[in-house]
Amino acid sequence: LMYQRAQELGCTGSHFVNPNGLHDPNHYSTAWDIYLFTREAMKNETFMKICSTASYVVPATNMSEERELYTTNSLISNWRIMGYQYDGADGIKTGSTEESGYCLVSTAKRSGRRLVAVVLGCKGNGATVESFSESAKLYNWAYNNFSMRQVAATDELYRQPVALSKQTDTVMLYPAQSVEAFLPKDAKDEDIRKSVTLKEDVVNAPVTAGQELGTLTITYNDQVCAEEPLLAQ
């Protein structure tokens, strides 16, 4: 089931032999696959609540006294190591073995923009753990050099040929909603390209308002940064 779900998420570089992540030569993954796992897990509100909790008091039971547990993620807590707390960080999980080094998948949110960072194989020696400092560097670089930018608006119109209509031979299409993309602040307009993919080269009448007839794809430097359905006007 783990392999099946990983494939459904688009993971291609992972191999599992245990559920706990402890070292085994045949147990491995990649930073990209871990990001894909994380992106899916973040859709679960309970998961995010747990991962963003710095400490939690476990009530006393008939087996143990009250206990307080702390996160090992120093981006959100100073309990374990001082000096790594990062403004906006709210997850997710540390991991380390002698073979893998110090690893961290984390997330941070500033000005409404959430980012995920994955660092693997970092060095550490008690009070200094590079997985936290390297993650902070990645966040600082991204937030300092990228910003949200509108790349499509609902008043943009595209043509769709129509057959079997007495009134017109085309219908106008528009993006279902305005589209923003997280792009370099110095991105040039000529490097942002738009392409239209129609479901059919020619659609038969009648066409109803709001009918989905295609997709608008926006790319930056040949990388897809957004896709949006095109609807009939």
Q: What residue spans do the PLM features occupy?
A:
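Domain-terminus/edge residues, biased toward the C-terminal soluble/receptor-binding domains
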Residues: 11-15, 25-28, 32-233
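Short, charged, amphipathic alpha-helices and their helix-cap/turn boundaries
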Residues: 1-15
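Diglycine-centered glycine-rich loop/turn motifs
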Residues: 18-19
